[in-house]
Regions:
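Short acidic alpha-helix initiation/capping motifs at coil-to-helix transition points
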Residues: 1-5, 34-40
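N-terminal acidic leader/helix
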Residues: 1-28
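Charged low-complexity stretches with an acidic bias
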Residues: 4, 56-76
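Alpha-solenoid HEAT/Armadillo repeat architecture
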Residues: 15, 30, 48-52
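Short alpha-helix boundary/capping elements
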Residues: 18, 34, 52-55, 67-68
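Secretory-pathway low-complexity, repetitive Gly/Ala/Ser/Pro-rich segments with frequent Tyr
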Residues: 20-24, 38, 57
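Short, charge-rich amphipathic interface segments used for partner binding and complex assembly
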Residues: 39-64
Length: 76
């Protein structure tokens, strides 16, 4: 049996998906169990690596704005 890492497993899971199916994978992962977070991270990494610096900065700006609207949970 071939050993595959997490990135490879996630890419394999979505490899032949249509745009609609890929949208479903993303939307069903958002807000789901935390086990879905690594998959979203791999997909985001793929987008990031193929983005121009201006697009990356736009994503960072959008993310920063969303983070600032959140209320941090205080550790007990």
């Amino acid at each position: 049996m071939n050993d595959i890492n997490l990135r490879q497993a996630i890419i394999q899971r979505v490899y032949d998906k249509s745009n609609e199916e890929l949208t479903d994978v993303i939307e069903s992962s958002i807000g789901a169990d935390e086990r879905a977070l690594p998959g979203l991270g791999v997909l985001f990494e793929m987008i990031w690596l193929e983005s121009e610096p201006a697009q990356q900065q736009a994503m960072v700006g959008s993310l920063h704005a969303k983070i600032q609207k959140q209320t941090p949970v205080q550790a007990e």
